[in-house]
């Protein structure tokens, strides 16, 4: 089954985007599994060859739902020199960065050390991925900035990796996933938030991840489409946990980005949280303000995948609640549900809001002049 059918010649012929933009969700890939070996101690080479990796969702590496396309990516994104989509800097520049006038691209590497049962291996792989981002990507193209990937189930070790990268201009955020062993507000993850706040780094919470639990609240669904729709449900769970466990009271300077789960659900979640907090606030005395206030103050949102209601004023109502200053443009390149920059926004967006969404908000959040 092929999801994205545009041929490479068609993509190359598309008109270039004149507006300078930040793409806050780009997925780089390794050309081969061994591409990470130069950044790993030799003991891990032997370990990976003999035992491979064992994620929480089972004893085999890989997602439980096939993605309909290899790596969930566009068919036209295969590099001409070979390798998986997203593994070639030169082709990424030619197909995406240059024609779309991307002046800031935030890398979110997936299929890394997150979610591995062996915590020592997970930490080693995450550190290697961070070195790999510098060596292969950010040092070769100054437009690209990395995300500090951490083995988040070991909060203390993850915090050490964040502090190791603090102040390194190659990195602009910490990367977590939305599905973990426990909801993200749990105390096992607090060392990560403490270190991120110390480093002045926002945390990107990317939809996906496998903590060994069913991916819905009622079990395992039948279809990939259900997993896709379920990304927003999982992000809601993560965000409610962060607010109600008091993370933003404890770490008042911490900012987070909800990545690749839409944002149309944000107002209704805020309303429901506020209503229940008014009635049950004695259970959570550490939550000192209405939950929606924490969401509006501490949370940014990537546009991709943007909701597409029949009436665009409905979309604008949602954004007005969130705030135009809290939206970050993202394409999800090279994945199949990529948002075309020249077509993503409906008519009626003011020039000021358009500039903020495409570039200004990202520069402010990530401290890029």
Please tell me what each predicted stretch does:
Residues 2-20, 30-99, 103-104, 131, ...:
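Mid-to-C-terminal alpha-helical segments outside catalytic/metal-binding sites
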Residues 83-91, 126-131, 182-191:
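Aromatic- and glycine-enriched glycan-recognition loops and surfaces
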Residues 137-145, 150, 156, 161-321, ...:
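Catalytic pocket-lining loop regions of alpha/beta-barrel enzymes
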Residues 84, 121-124, 153, 231-235:
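Short, surface-exposed alpha-helical recognition segments that flank or form part
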Residues 28-32, 105-107, 113-119, 155-158, ...:
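Short catalytic/ligand-binding loop motif for oxyanion handling, primarily in non-cytosolic enzymes
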Residues 75-82, 97-119, 143-149, 172-176:
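Divalent metal-dependent hydrolysis catalytic cores, especially in the metallo-beta-lactamase
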């Amino acid at each position: 089954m092929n999801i994205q059918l545009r041929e490479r010649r068609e993509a190359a012929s598309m008109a270039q985007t004149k507006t300078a933009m930040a793409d806050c969700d780009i997925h780089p890939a390794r050309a081969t599994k061994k591409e990470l070996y130069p950044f790993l101690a030799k003991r891990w080479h032997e370990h990976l060859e003999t035992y491979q990796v064992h994620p929480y969702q089972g004893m085999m590496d890989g997602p439980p739902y096939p993605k309909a396309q290899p790596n969930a990516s566009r068919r036209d994104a295969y590099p001409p020199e070979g390798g998986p989509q997203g593994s070639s800097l030169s082709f990424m520049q030619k197909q995406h960065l240059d024609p779309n006038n991307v002046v800031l691209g935030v890398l979110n590497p997936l299929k890394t050390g997150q979610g591995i049962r062996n915590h020592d291996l997970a930490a080693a792989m995450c550190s290697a991925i961070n070195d790999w981002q510098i060596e292969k990507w950010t040092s070769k193209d100054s437009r690209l900035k990395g995300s500090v990937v951490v083995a988040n189930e070991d909060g203390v070790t993850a915090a050490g990796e964040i502090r190791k990268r603090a102040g390194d201009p190659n990195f602009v955020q910490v990367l977590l996933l939305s599905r973990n062993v426990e909801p993200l507000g749990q105390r096992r993850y607090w060392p990560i938030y403490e270190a991120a706040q110390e480093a002045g780094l926002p945390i990107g919470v990317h939809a996906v991840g496998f903590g060994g639990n069913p991916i819905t609240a009622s079990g395992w669904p039948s279809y990939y489409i259900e997993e896709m729709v379920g990304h927003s449900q999982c992000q809601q769970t993560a965000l409610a946990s962060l607010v109600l466990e008091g993370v933003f009271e404890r770490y008042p300077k911490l900012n987070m980005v909800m990545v690749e789960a839409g944002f149309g659900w944000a107002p209704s979640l805020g309303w429901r949280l506020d209503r229940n907090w008014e009635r049950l606030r004695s259970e959570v005395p550490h939550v000192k303000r209405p939950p929606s206030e924490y969401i509006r103050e501490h949370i940014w949102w990537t546009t991709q995948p943007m909701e597409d209601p029949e009436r665009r004023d409905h979309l604008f109502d949602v954004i007005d609640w969130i705030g135009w200053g809290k939206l970050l443009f993202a394409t999800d390149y090279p994945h199949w549900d990529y948002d075309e920059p020249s077509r993503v926004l409906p008519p009626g967006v003011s020039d000021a809001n358009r500039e903020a969404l495409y570039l200004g908000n990202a520069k402010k959040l990530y401290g890029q002049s």
